[in-house]
């Protein structure tokens, strides 16, 4: 088997990105971190991650704009995306799923739940 999966974490909260880097690293994932939407799109091209954990409310480009661009990309359109956000409104959840998010998790969240959802997506299983 090749190298461990690379996960792009796009969130503007440094403590959260550190937590996710630690938890994902402990499970054998490699991580790449972006703190705004523009950086997330650049890291997507550089790192070619196998999945993206994406905050909805970030500076420069918000998570929905990043998701739109991922789904419009010939290269990355099939990359699994989990939205991880404090926005819990029905319109937010439905809007993200309609744009192509594979999963949606509301903060505060259980890190173990995120890990299970991520593993299922990487294995090609939908919840």
Residue positions per predicted region:
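C-terminal output helix
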Residues: 109-119
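Alpha4 helix (beta4-alpha4-beta5 surface) of REC/receiver domains from two-component response regulators
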Residues: 65, 88-103, 116
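Acidic, metal-coordinating helix/loop segments flanking the phosphotransfer/catalytic sites
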Residues: 33-51
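Acidic catalytic/metal-coordinating carboxylates
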Residues: 35-39, 55, 62-68
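The short loop immediately C-terminal to the conserved phospho-acceptor aspartate in CheY-like receiver
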Residues: 56-57, 82-83, 87
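The feature encodes the CheY-like receiver
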Residues: 17, 58-60, 77, 89, ...
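Charged docking surfaces used in two-component/phosphorelay signaling
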Residues: 18-26
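Short amphipathic alpha-helix used as the core "switch/output" element in two-component signaling
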Residues: 42, 64-77
